[in-house]
Amino acid sequence: MPIVHPLEAITLDLDDTLWPVLPTLVAAEATLAQWLRARAPATATAFTPQARLALRRQLLAESPERAHDMSWLRRELLRRALIQAGDPPDLADAAFEVFLAARQQVTLYPDVLPVLQRWSQRYRLVAVTNGNAEIDAIGLGPYFTGCVSAHDIGCAKPDPRMFHAACALAGTDPAATLHVGDDFQLDVRAARAAGLQAAWLRRPDLKHETPPDGGAHADAPAFDSLHAMDAHLHPRSPLG
């Protein structure tokens, strides 16, 4: 489905759309591990990837209604790990803040800043994320009207309430709003189901699912960069 003008707002996913998230999370885990080794060595030893996965599964089984809240999951996971290792559980909040701060140390894709600068002069931009990246801490706040997060809304994509909240924040109708994201199900199809237009950003350095019909174009056009998407939106004045 082609993008229909006029557009009034663009909503953007964050992780794996504006930056690759895996290197960020790996670095944040390493920063947290170093902090734990200094302050809760027993937890640092026991807090292996396998232990984290087991605790995460336990938390999701106990509190499925909190599955959307990555910050709660991480904080509670740390608290449980500290208790199991015999370290003070009140270190959980400080440990979480260490992880959260490191999680904001992202490496933007090269096309992000020039395109955001341009789009922010034409459209209202709203971030839409299931994670706990913070646009102000990352330095992108000036380009955005605001951010809709699963933690704040109480649900996660593909729930249409995420997209409707973004449109409300932008003050636009869904039909005049374009959502941009890397995940075909959570971004493209979910946005279309919520009444928004959608564009699929398929970064070449990431693996992307193949839609059931073999292509995205029935739901949304696909692009390999924000530059390519911008050139499609504004064919007479593409970015250089």
Predicted regions and their residues:
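N-terminal helical cap/lid subdomain that shapes the substrate entry/recognition surface
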Residues: 3-110
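Asp-based, Mg2+/Mn2+-dependent phosphohydrolase catalytic module
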Residues: 1-10, 22-23, 87, 113-126, ...
